[in-house]
């Protein structure tokens, strides 16, 4: 690399990744094949439009690449339609929402503080700025989605769109129940599986593809691909919607909302990386990987419970869980800082009905996808939980330094993908 300053920074990041235990639920480690595609000469090509309908010449090769990504995405998810151009999950959500409803319409999404996402109706997001947003949450007793309460809220506010999905919810979501509620109030249903896509495509979680009108996802997290977004549709893909006062098929409306509605030229190098990741996820080994992710995550959660900690909702069905730090009398922000000092990386997280500000929070979010990509098994994951608890309980700087040395030695024995 000619730029020595940047090369040194990248090498520093590579060292950080090697020597840290990565537990951020939205992060993962991509394969060499994905990195090669994303770092390829495809970054040179501008390709506004869609395959065979570009606004630039010389696109016959990237047409084949995008078509490959589309066909693999459709096969992987069992979808009738796929748009692989969204630059991120948030942009996928924006395009999907705009294809279904118009500004000022009502949306009903999961409360951010209960595990939802900014793009599901938060006032600081386009979804709360451009639309009349309402929210549902979890039961105070079980900390699990109360579908009867979702139905009650939907009947009261009569939304045009219901969004099912979450960013810090550890239980499987029943998409069919959401569709029943949406149909009762004549609303569209958008399912956001950004966090659980890997579990959906391997059959560990139920699929929303033929249940929802549209499904969105990121391509990283549990899919283990490059950072990016994806929009999918099943049997509803050819339904007619009113888009800009014209009758259009749903897939046509989505295409228009991605380009030119919210984006210009697609990132062809990233789309190539998506194609690689979809191909990897179609292999039998990927199902084994996801099975291990679930096993490792459950093992960590169960160990925390055995040590007296409270896990939000009592456990996990997926790749993440939330730990209530009340037993220690510290905040999520405190925990995040202490753990980073011993090379354990995770994030502070508010818990349902939290009395603390999100910048402080009462909990932490722990994800098992990235450590599983490095080859950690169930026993290794329990050892990770032990490191966390030791670091959070100690008051000694000497002990923290000792734990850091142990963490570096432990995690460095596992290869990066």
From Swiss-Prot:
Give site residues, Plays an important role in substrate specificity. Answer: 220
* Keywords from the UniProt entry: Amino-acid biosynthesis, Cytoplasm, One-carbon metabolism, Pyridoxal phosphate, Transferase
Q: Name one Pfam family in it.
A: SHMT
List the SUPFAM superfamilies: PLP-dependent transferases
Q: Where does (6S)-5,6,7,8-tetrahydrofolate bind?
A: 112, 116-118, 247
List the Gene3D superfamilies hit by this protein, alphabetically. Aspartate Aminotransferase, domain 1, Type I PLP-dependent aspartate aminotransferase-like (Major domain)
Recall the GO molecular function terms of this protein's record: glycine hydroxymethyltransferase activity; pyridoxal phosphate binding
| Protein name in UniProt | Serine hydroxymethyltransferase
Modification type N6-(pyridoxal phosphate)lysine: residues: 221
Query: CDD domains attached here?
Result: SHMT
Regarding protein family, the annotation reads:
Belongs to the SHMT family.
What does the annotation say about its assembly with partners? Homodimer.
Q: Per its database record, what is this protein's job?
A: Catalyzes the reversible interconversion of serine and glycine with tetrahydrofolate (THF) serving as the one-carbon carrier. This reaction serves as the major source of one-carbon groups required for the biosynthesis of purines, thymidylate, methionine, and other important biomolecules. Also exhibits THF-independent aldolase activity toward beta-hydroxyamino acids, producing glycine and aldehydes, via a retro-aldol mechanism.
Q: Does the keyword Endoplasmic reticulum apply?
A: no
Enzyme Commission identifier(s):
2.1.2.1
The kind of enzyme this is, by top-level EC class, is transferase
